[in-house]
Amino acid sequence: MMEVLVLGSGVVGLTSAWYLAQAGHDVTVVDRQPRGAEETSFANAGQISYGYSSPWAAPGIPQKALKWMLEKHAPLKIQPSLDPALLSWMGKMLLNCQLSRYQVNKSRMLAIANYSRECLKALNQTYSLDYQGRQRGTLQVFRDEKQLTAIEKDMQLLAQSGVRFELLNVAQCLTHEPGLAPVQEKLVGGLWLPDDETGDYYLFCQQLTELAKQQGVRFHFDCHIQQLVCEGKKIIGVQTDLGLLKADAYVVALGSYSTSLLKPLGIEIPVYPVKGYSLTLPIIDEKFAPQSTVMDETYKVALTRFSDRIRVAGTAELAGFDPAIPEARKATIEMVARDLFPHGGDFAKGQFWTGFRPMTPDGTPIIGATPYTNLYTNTGHGTLGWTMACGSASILADVLTHGESPLSRLGLDLFRYPKAS
């Protein structure tokens, strides 16, 4: 057994703490917020999207990005900047848009997602967490025939990875999401992913925090992390505003903030904050609300059903750590909701939110060892934090405890990047 400090209490940090504790370690979680999941894990889409696990870096994206620059409601926005971190990240992302790299990255992401599904299933079977979860799948809807044609290659990868799916015509889409009936003329078909789930991300994190406490995990909230202190290639502590915290091993699970903490150690990880937005609406008419998750392929916006709310989330904006919510981004999110489910939610009572998704240029998280003998990472999950959280945490616990995991062959640690250390 080792004493382990987990830095970060979003869904990835919390699940890391849980699986490390289950492996027999003495775990403490450190976070600057007063409770877990107060930042990127707070109000995102609420999807557990095993079948939709796919990198943003894909064939055709460079051309689409140029087109999107001129569109009002584009799914990707780039704020002009000479930030070296942004330029470097974008360059790496462009390289990963090659078909061969996309296929490798998507296969790797699907493997993590499928493993994570089994981990979450086992967790729920044992502890019966209640987070307004629904196991009713994801419906990816298409607005033009080109999207239907383009999805064929993804379907091949889904089949190879053992992910269940079904290509649907519009009438079949309505059997899963009858609330789309008033706008069916806008659609040409859809892809049904029956094993996907939804739920209140924040509620899941709060319940897991309490469960972890019962298992002996300690939490230092309202504790600001300043730097990692090392001697040679070993970490000897974490300097915080509460003093120097020491352990046998350290896990960096700080999402987009992992990069700045690791950089003084000479560790360069390509994790960039890709800003996302959400709108939460009270449901006013259930028959016109989504039943599970509807993913609008045109605008890359997800509409997810909770018990009495609709969560509309999407867009990707490269703007650093700017916390502002521009009216233009609000307009895009609201437009998609009004376009697909105009009568389902109370737009007058809608609440907007933004968060910083920790995105890698290849879409795959960075899980595992570092050049420092007792330092580990679990970050870079992008839009798939909850989807991959339990599996990633289990992988991390295996690597920290045994030196490898069943998925080590995938090359998930930072050493897959030539200049990571």
From Swiss-Prot:
Query: Which GO cellular component does the record give, naming just one?
Result: plasma membrane
Q: Which reaction does it catalyse?
A: a D-alpha-amino acid + A + H2O = a 2-oxocarboxylate + AH2 + NH4(+)
Biological process terms in GO annotation: D-alanine catabolic process
Q: Which domain of life is it from?
A: Bacteria
Q: GO molecular-function annotation terms?
A: D-amino-acid dehydrogenase activity
Keywords of this protein's UniProt record, alphabetized? FAD, Flavoprotein, Oxidoreductase
Cross-referenced SUPFAM superfamilies, in alphabetical order?
A: FAD-linked reductases, C-terminal domain, FAD/NAD(P)-binding domain
**Listed EC numbers:** 1.4.99.-
Q: What is the recorded function of this protein according to its Swiss-Prot or TrEMBL entry?
A: Oxidative deamination of D-amino acids.
The record's family statement is:
Belongs to the DadA oxidoreductase family.
**Which named protein is this?**
D-amino acid dehydrogenase
State the species of origin: Vibrio cholerae serotype O1 (strain ATCC 39541 / Classical Ogawa 395 / O395)
